[in-house]
């Protein structure tokens, strides 16, 4: 008689995804971040659920309800900081996961890559509406500035912004709907993750060599379950160090001041994980142009499969494109730094140069390097 895990309709799904799944024998630790993202998502949903039990989405009580969670709820401070810093860990894993996909050419698994881009956008939307909920100064002004960008859309812009706000400014209606969005979106993300995995398991995983690994597969369990478990322990260690020793290091001090529509903070900026896109937005003097650049800074990921002219899979044996890749990563870090700086010389100029470089590397330099490498290696 066949063992239950191979026969039971539900358990066999888990078996095919996490136990008997044939995986390449040579995938490195860069492949750990998918499972780490799953763990981050579970942490966020669980801590978020407990926070939602005590939070009130009303402009008069939202700020004090967060203070109440931290002061009066048993381990409320821990749940709140796990949720806030868990979001940062989520984005660190997300950026590394995408970066690995670019480096090793995983974008050639088209359906998986495109669902991944949708996941990235959905996660960014979730984080944005979540940041508004504590109703501090930066929550309020961040919501005002970012939603106001939609007014740049010709003809329908102003109407659209007021429709999203539920009035003529960011107010009670906005906070209530943002809470509703923040509650529902993680479950949509979970559904998309399942679709992401479904498409990945249709083709099988990529590997560092970029070669077909069908002739050399090993079972996911125990090899990669143990490897993933080590990654999870390291992730939890870093998260707990952040939460217990430096809970506010990634936050903004302005968010400890209750929202005040009559007093604008000196420097309005989003959370650190949006700063690169914010820098690109600010580097264009025209409002509509800035909004388009902001959207394209993420959607440009969809262009990677179209701009890949290389005859080799991944960058493991392509030093020219490898160099450009690391310049691209360094440029992203520069953009992140610029996004957190005031709008004045020399930061504006550095931001503009970095923004141009961001798009130039992806659209011009990398495809050119692909063609040059093909030519050098006589891969026609």
Curated annotation (Swiss-Prot):
Gene this chain is encoded by: MT-CYB
Binding positions (heme b b562): 83, 182
Cofactor dependence: heme b
Major localisation: mitochondrion
Quaternary context: The cytochrome bc1 complex contains 11 subunits: 3 respiratory subunits (MT-CYB, CYC1 and UQCRFS1), 2 core proteins (UQCRC1 and UQCRC2) and 6 low-molecular weight proteins (UQCRH/QCR6, UQCRB/QCR7, UQCRQ/QCR8, UQCR10/QCR9, UQCR11/QCR10 and a cleavage product of UQCRFS1). This cytochrome bc1 complex then forms a dimer.
Membrane topology: Multi-pass membrane protein
The organism's taxonomic lineage, starting at the top: Eukaryota, Metazoa, Chordata, Craniata, Vertebrata
Keyword Mitochondrion among UniProt keywords: yes
Cell location: Mitochondrion inner membrane
Record keywords, A-Z: Electron transport, Heme, Iron, Membrane, Metal-binding, Mitochondrion, Mitochondrion inner membrane, Respiratory chain, Transmembrane, Transmembrane helix, Transport, Ubiquinone
Protein name, per record: Cytochrome b
Family as reported in the entry's similarity comment: Belongs to the cytochrome b family.
Database matches in PANTHER family: CYTOCHROME B
Residues that, per the record, bind a ubiquinone: 201
Residues annotated as transmembrane: 33-53, 77-98, 113-133, 178-198, 226-246, 288-308, 320-340, 347-367
GO molecular function: metal ion binding; ubiquinol-cytochrome-c reductase activity
